[in-house]
Amino acid sequence: RNRKIESGRRYKLFFSNETFEKFSGSGTPDSEFEALKVLSREFTSGKRKLPVVYEDKDVIFINKPTGMLSQKAKPEDISANEYILAYLIAKGELTESSFRTFRPSICNRLDRNTSGLLAAGKTLKGLQEMAKALKERSVQKYYRCIVKGTVKEASYLKGYLQKDESSNQVLIRRTKPSEGEWLPIETEYKPIRCMGGYTEFEVHLMTGRSHQIRAHLASIGHPIIGDYKYGDSGVNVYFKRNARITSQLLHASRFVFEDGREITAPCGAEFERAWNVIENL
């Protein structure tokens, strides 16, 4: 039964052992940390390198490659989060005892096939401050993408987005429909490079909705190369055949903080392959 909590009164809470362990972190299975230790040996041996673009005592930023999950979708997955944990174990910054009380974690998410900047909190302070900055939008996020079409001027888009959970796709409308739950979106872009009927944009993600950039640009006739949900099938087939592009050319390239600091991550080789093809059209 719902009951209002009153200030100054004492309350007793009763949990099962399992629930208490989950809340306290003391119930972390040894096997989970051991699995991360095994993964960490790939870093200590030099077999694997984490693409770190910035790191201090509280936070770490990596350049996530295309195809890597940001977080686990299934228990057996190895995501960017696990690689960061293993990296910190290899450095001696994360021990089994500290793992039981606090787990470093990513602060933002990217789709599996979107590359670029992922931020993670190494400490509780780092995690809280980064999460707050992202939530309050005091850090500005910029992306790079290559789209179909010739665009020579910057533009600002407003609209409304609705997600269809069954298809994992979103719909975009310029004006808010009278029925259904539609979220306001804002997207700003400017052309960086234009050639052969294709344009590379820097996109300022002003509202961070699911699939926002991909669907918003497609809605104005400029779908991203390699986007199999919202893109041009003929364009996608051409670039898959000629440039080995198998997913959307969308990359989280730059974070800009209120104090003027910037953290950047270079685009992957797939961008260069796409431009090599475009230059020879």
PLM segments and residue spans:
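RNA pseudouridine synthases
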Residues: 1-166, 180-186, 194, 262, ...
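Short Pro/Gly-enriched beta-strand edge/turn motifs at strand-loop
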Residues: 33, 171, 183-184, 233-239
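Pseudouridine synthase
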Residues: 76-84, 196-255
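Short polybasic amphipathic segments
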Residues: 161, 254-257
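Short aromatic-glycine motifs in intrinsically disordered, low-complexity regions
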Residues: 168-180, 243-244
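Long C-terminal interaction/binding lobes of large macromolecular proteins
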Residues: 189
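Beta-rich strand-turn-strand
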Residues: 209, 269-270
